Amino acid sequence: QFRPLPDSPDLPRALYTAAQVREFDRLTIEQFGIAGDELMERAGRSAFDQLQRRWPEAHRVAVLTGTGNNGGDGFVVARLARAAGLEVCVLQLGDRVRLRGDALLNAERWVEAGGIWQPFDGIPANTDVIVDAMLGTGLQRDVGGNWAGAIDAVNASGRPCLAIDIPSGLNADTGVVMGHAVRAAATVSFIGLKLGLFTADGPDC
C-alpha cells in the first residue's frame, strides 16, 4: 500500500530508501568536506526549530535517546532546548557505553553544558513535548524489551511527540511497524524523505 505525498509545496517530491540516504550522507562528508558532527548539529537544529515552531508554548521537554546517531541528534536538540531556556530531561534507552563517534561527542557536549542524563524510567508527568530520538532508519527487527516499553509509554502519555528522522519502530523502507512504533505528531526527516513514511503503516505513525 502506498499513499501519495501530501499536497504541500514545502515537501520534496522524491522518496528514498534508508540505504540511499546513508549513501547521500557519506558522500556529503567525503566529497563536500562537511564533518559528521556538523551534519548532526544541523539535523538537531532543524528538529529543534520545528519543535519551537509547532509548540511555541512548550516549556518542559523530554528527549528519549538511543545509542546510535538518532540518539546523537536527540542530544543536540536537548542542548539547544536547554540553551533556549526550556526545562529538558534526557532519558536514555540502551547501554550508554555503546555510544560511539558523533553520538558520543554530542552526549558529552550535553553533559558539559550542565545537562542531566538518566536511564528511561517513564515519561515525566509535567512534560509538554516528547522528542523521539530512540531508533533510526537502520531498524530491521522487531522492537522488544525496554524499547517497546518506552514506545508504548510515549503513545500512552497523551503528549505530542516529535520524531527525529523516522518514528521509532517504523521500518524506513517498508513502512511496517516492527512490533511497536511511536505515533508522532510530527516527524523531521533529514537529507531525503524515507519511503517508509508513506507506505503501509507509515502515514499513521
List the predicted regions and their residue ranges.
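A cross-family phosphate/adenosyl-ligand binding-site feature
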Residues: 2-130, 135, 139-145
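YjeF_N-associated NAD(P)HX repair module
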Residues: 2-23, 127-205
